[in-house]
């Protein structure tokens, strides 16, 4: 026999807040959700993230250990 009333209450209009601002409305088991980061302020999604490593790994190794490049034979 299945158990009755074991599922959490579902809220179709749960509000999501970030920094005190209402961001979106979703379905959830909690009436309000407070998040620190979302796609609207994350550097990856906003395009403000920069790739710092422009030099390859092999070149860094060669420079670090002062290895001279030689011609392949």
UniProtKB/Swiss-Prot annotation:
It is found in: Plastid, Chloroplast. PROSITE patterns: RIBOSOMAL_L31. Keywords: Chloroplast, Plastid, Ribonucleoprotein, Ribosomal protein, RNA-binding, rRNA-binding. It holds the Pfam family Ribosomal_L31. The keyword Disulfide bond does not apply. SUPFAM superfamilies: L28p-like. GO terms for cellular component: chloroplast; ribonucleoprotein complex; ribosome. InterPro entries: Ribosomal_bL28/bL31-like_sf (IPR034704), Ribosomal_bL31 (IPR002150), Ribosomal_bL31_A (IPR027491), Ribosomal_bL31_sf (IPR042105). GO terms for molecular function: rRNA binding; structural constituent of ribosome. One of its GO terms (biological process) is translation. Binds the 23S rRNA. NCBIfam families: L31, PRK00528.1. Part of the 50S ribosomal subunit. Belongs to the bacterial ribosomal protein bL31 family. Type A subfamily. This is Large ribosomal subunit protein bL31c. It comes from Palmaria palmata (Dulse). The gene is rpl31.
């Amino acid at each position: 026999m299945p158990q009755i009333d074991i599922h959490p209450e579902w809220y179709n209009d749960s509000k999501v807040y970030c920094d005190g601002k209402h961001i979106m409305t979703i379905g959830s088991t909690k009436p309000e959700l407070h998040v620190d980061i979302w796609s609207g302020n994350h550097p990856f999604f906003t395009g403000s993230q920069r790739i710092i490593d422009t030099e390859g790994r092999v070149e860094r190794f060669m420079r670090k250990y002062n290895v001279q490049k030689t011609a392949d034979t």
